[in-house]
Each structure stands twice: as structure tokens, then as C-alpha cells.
Amino acid sequence: MSAPMEVSFSAPPPPDAASAAAAAPSLVPAVSAAAVAATTVSCSPQPPTGSPSADDRILVSVEVLLHATSTARAEDVCAAVERMLEARSLSYVDGPVPIPNDDPFLLANVKRIQICDTDEWTENHKVLLFWQVRPVVHVFQLSEDGPGEEPGEDDTLSSFNEWALPAKEFDGLWESLLYEVGLKQRLLRYAASALLFTEKGVDPCLVSWNRIVLLHGPPGTGKTSLCKALAQKLSIRFKSRYSMCQLIEVNAHSLFSKWFSESGKLVAKLFQKIQEMVEEESNLVFVLIDEVESLAAARQAAISGSEPSDSIRVVNALLTQMDKLKSWPNVIILTTSNITTAIDIAFVDRADIKAYVGPPTLQARYEILRSCLQELLRVGILTHTQGGNSLCLLSYFSLMENQHCPEVADPHGSVHLSGLLHKAAEICEGLSGRTLRKLPFLAHASVANPSCCDASAFLHALIQTAQRELSESRG
């Protein structure tokens, strides 16, 4: 779904041309005003009459990753990137932007420039031109510290793991998660609104919000990964507001004690530590509770005798502590569940967003498999097809528009090979995203000559592997 940023010097290219450009991105300086005046032909597009004002332009995020060794000020880097974007006439699509070779400051300090948030437009075959867009630049560095554990008492399990965000471990995770159009953007907008309402002092007695997200659905659909990726993305977006961002992943199993009534006390103790973190106003804290049903089990089950009575105290303690965190503006609680019917209704009611994350759609399955094959091509595990041309697997929408192209007759052409990939994606209906990302490995293990695997042969092996995996999953 992601494609490199493209240059637009005329009308927006059709989707097939955009895909071709994605294979070999280039960024060319726009012609200066003096050069245009000296000629009778203008090479750069001019904003049409009645173009949007600055307030009406579409906000597009530009994420700028600094080198780990860079000591440049974020303000200076932001200004340099804004000047670079203003000096060029561009169309905006998700993907990397080449760093210009004539800018030594950016070359020395910036590792990557990435355009984000345009997927909703490109899904509808709309191209965002430079005069329609107001770029919002976010400058950040990745933390390489890794997770830290909160040691438990008496050799017990640690109660939580902690990451400083944005973390190197989660870099690229957001882009690798593919869902129905709009799900990720909906979560981003929700979090931004929740933080804004709190910062502006909106009266919670009149307008209620809890800053709690509940993602539910079958196992293997990427709910936990989406929570971590969301925290990473928000830490980048709010870097200018919060100097420190943390992700606290709660180890739910550590909160249950063999001693009666002790579990509720462990929950209270954990949230007391979290509250100490959020007392620092410049610290944005994300609390991740995976498989929250283990903590927020329905109290009705305990009353009926099917659950230990101590679980009532755990649920009560959890709800009480979450209500206490509500008064702090710099904390967001992210939760996941595989069994929503087992969660206490009082907890479900507190969640602002209850988003279902189901098995990937056909488009998502195709793009997941496509991203896997592109990675295998990048590292050389798969060889390019015959004819000397580099293999370019088409995006889902480009394939839909080019599937009747005469090139289909060419068994080594991009359309034909993308069609084989599409067939594999169709067969995989019902498989989780986790299983889909295993398929290329299983397919490679099944080929006769894995050391020199042709892309065409690999795709046929992928289809057979998908059929076998689906058959085994159905018993």
C-alpha cells in the first residue's frame, strides 16, 4: 500500500503509472520563478485559481528520523525539511522521500524522511498535489535501550515491561500492519482528540471521555502489535509537546496471587507506580494491557461460582485505578481481548473506542504477502525473473486496473506474477495476519532448490503452501 513519494510536473498520473514510479522514485527540484519567466513553457504545476487557503489544506504528516549520533536541534531540522518541501512541486503519497544531495545539513543529520497519512486518499485513487497539502513535520530519534522490567518481589514475575518511545524495536511496525481502510487513522484521530480535550480543560462532567481503547477480535490479527505501533506513532506526533514518552506493558499474570484478597492489592500497587510516572507533566504514558479479559473477567461469573471470588476484587481494583488515572491528561490505556463476552460490562462501557480487528480482507492479504515477497527480493533470497528486468509486484489497485493487460501472457511479467500472488491471497481467506506472514517462510522451505529460487516458482509454491495451510486449519 505504501509507495515512494513521486514528483508531479503535470496532471496526476494514473494508478499504473504511479506504481511504475514507485519502483524507481526520484525527486527533482522545481523550476525556479526566474527560469520560468525566461521560457515560454512552465515545467512545474501552478496552483489553480481558487486553490485551498492555508486553513483548508489537508494536513499530511512528514516524519523525519535523525541519525542516532545527530545533535542537531529539532527546530533547525524541521525548518530545513520545510524549505526542502517548499522548493519542490510534489504529489504526496505515503512512502520515503529521498534526501537531496545538495543539502549537507540534512545529509549529515537525517536518516529518513517519510510521508504518512495519505492512504485514505490513495485508496480512493486521489492524488494529493502540493498546493492541496500543508505538511506537518515531526522530528525524532529512536531509543535503542530496549525494554526494561519492573522486578517482582520474592522471585515473582515482573509486573510490567517498560519502553522509552519512540523505540527502535517498534520502528516500521505501523507500516507493516494492514487493515481495512481507515482503522489506523481512526485510532490516531481518537488519541489526538482525547489528549486535546484534556489539555483544553473540557469539563468531564459535561463531555465524557476516558482515554481507553479496546481492540477485540480473534487471535493472530495483530491487536497487540497495533497497540504498540499506535503508541510509537503517537510518541512521534506529540514529541514537541511531551519530552518523554513511555510504553508500560502490564504482565497480567503477575497480578494474581495464591493468597486470598492479595490480587486486588497487587493491581493497586501496579497502578500506583504508573501514577507516579504520569505525575511528571512532560511525560506521556501508554499503558498496554494485553488479553484484558484475564483481569477484567465478568463479575457475574464469579457470583455464579464459575470463577474464583477473588476475581471480583481484581475487577473492582482495576476499575477503581483506571478511574483515578482519568484525572491525568498524559496517559492513554490500550487494551486487547480475544473474548469480549468474558469482559466485565463496566470495563467495556469505559472504553471510548471498541474496535473489532478481524481477519485481513483480500486487499490486506494481498498487500501483506506482497510486502513479504518484496523483502525476500531485497535481501536476495528470491531472484528476479528472466529478461534482465527487476521484478515489480503491483499494488492491489494497480493489479485490478492492469489484470487484462496484454502483458498477462508473459509468464515473467509483473502483471502475471502479481496475478499469481493475488490467487494465493484469495486462497488464504480466513487466515490470520500472523499466519500469512509465516507462509513465505513455509513456501521457501518447500521448494526443491531454496538457494536459488525464481520468483515465479516461488509463487506457485506459495499457492500450494496456502492451500495446505488452509486445509490444516480447517481440520
Swiss-Prot record:
GO BP field: meiotic DNA double-strand break formation; meiotic recombination checkpoint signaling; reciprocal meiotic recombination
Disruption phenotype: Male and female sterility due to defects in meiosis.
Pfam families associated with the record: AAA, AAA_lid_TRIP13_C, TRIP13_N
GO cellular component: chromosome; nucleus
Keywords: ATP-binding, Chromosome, Meiosis, Nucleotide-binding, Nucleus
Zinc among keywords: no
One GO molecular-function entry: ATP hydrolysis activity
Subcellular location: Nucleus; Chromosome
PANTHER family (alphabetical): PACHYTENE CHECKPOINT PROTEIN 2, PACHYTENE CHECKPOINT PROTEIN 2 HOMOLOG
Family the UniProt entry places it in: Belongs to the AAA ATPase family. PCH2 subfamily.
Protein name (database record): Pachytene checkpoint protein 2 homolog
Species of origin: Oryza sativa subsp. japonica (Rice)
Encoding gene (name): CRC1
